[in-house]
Amino acid sequence: MKIFVLIFSLFTFFSINIKAQVEAHFYSHTQFGKVEKKLVNKNINTTFKPLIFNDIDSLNFLYNENNNELIDNKFLNFFYAKENFGFVVSPLLNLSYSIDKEDSYSNNSRGLLLKGFVGNKIKFQSFFLENQSFFPNYLDSIVRFTRLPGVEIVPGQGEARPFKNRGFDYSRSEGYINYMINNNLTIQFGHGKHFIGNGYRSLILSDNTFSYPFLRLQTNLGIFRYTNLYTEFMDIRNNQLSIIDGYQGWSRKYMSLHFLECEINDRIKIGVFESIIYAENHAPGVSSLDINYLNPIIFYRPVEYSLGSPDNALIGIDLKINTSKNQFLYAQLILDEFTLEEMKSNNGYWANKYGYQIGYKFLDFLDVIGLNTNLEYNLVRPYTYSHWNSSSYGHYAQPLAHPLGANFDEFIVKLDYYYQRFSVNFKYNFARVGLDDSENLNISYGNDIFLDYNLRSSDYEIDMFNGIKTDITNLALDFAYLVDETNSLKVGVFVRSRTLVNENSDSNESYFGIYLKTDLFNYYYDR
């Protein structure tokens, strides 16, 4: 296990990609919308991100679409290229200032991005960001609410330190190396995030959390694409600093995930996934990494049962149907635990834990080139993703799937318009959530996935939105100009609004501001 961790640590600042990867992981949802039409028209798989291709693709930022030469754009970027080696170093920025009726907020993020290739089999990527932020009130509360004294977590960006009066100082680094063994098998390892799905949210695995060490294997066999993902997570909610057998630090847990996708025809792609999360074992002489879950081709449920069912297993389906050239439907279904007889009885059995997503995208909506629309609905039953020990489906105090955890439904509308270097982006979210009582940790209503599900309010009559029924509305509007395509540097103005209403509180926050940022990452503050 120490060797396993050491390998991950050595490559924290590097990244790699195969013969040619569209750097989808370094595109925000906004920027990815600009290239999604090209990907769909090329019939390229976009479900498991970051994407891995086995052919040099014109979307790769290192290459010109006509002659595969390096893009001649040296604005704020440093390029170097030889026949079998090349790299680019680009600055990373996220500078913003916003105000509301009473206060002002700001973000100051600076960093560097390194990308390159060695031959035609190896590519690498790495970045580092240093940040100081003053957040709006609702987000400030989210950062401070971890139920661990003195521990503050910025969503998706890790642990923060106090900065001046009410600000936060935090840093983040990611990187990975990708090696193509042959045309059918690729190995990728490093420190980063993943996203499974074709929508704005994912109920399977999203880039909502802080980054983590991982090993990824991807196998392509005809119409099948098979991915194995092995990760290491930190549990900082249920287990504080553990000092056992000379080990001190946050408790760790591990995930093994299989995702098998089949391209049935040019229109239909269906994927089946299974994952298992298991806690670290501190018993003397016992390896923390359970070799039972390293077999790349087994099903985890039989193995879990053979071990006495101590771990947290999920299964599910991802579906994408191209209804026309520029339109497609997508859906996800996840099952945590499920009893058919209890479902038929319609008695609200607590262990019928599942979730589903239904979405629709129309690229070049109404034949307006550059106008993309996205409608999406998500629902997750209470207690889904949770467990009785630290094996909940989360990392660094953040859910691995949807930011709201469980016991919610959500409706999303997105409109994005791109014209040359200009863009307009609009997003509307409405979520209804059954919140847990933050003042009472002895009972769980199924929203907080880190609470022990044995603290449930009852075994039956568990309805949606059980707990503190809360309505949350988020609105976002951006007008931006793309300064540099190489690192997606843009300047823009924005408006944000968030409303929360329940029986205990009623809040409405609205603010507007300006920014200069490299729009490469997703920040899920709409929660």
Predicted features and spans:
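Short regulatory "switch" loops immediately downstream of catalytic or recognition motifs
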Residues: 1, 10-12, 233-236, 431-434
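Bacterial Sec-dependent N-terminal signal peptides
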Residues: 1-24
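Short, charged, low-hydrophobicity "junction" segments
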Residues: 9-10, 61-67, 461-465
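Exposed, low-structure sequence patches enriched in small/polar residues
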Residues: 170, 263, 268-527
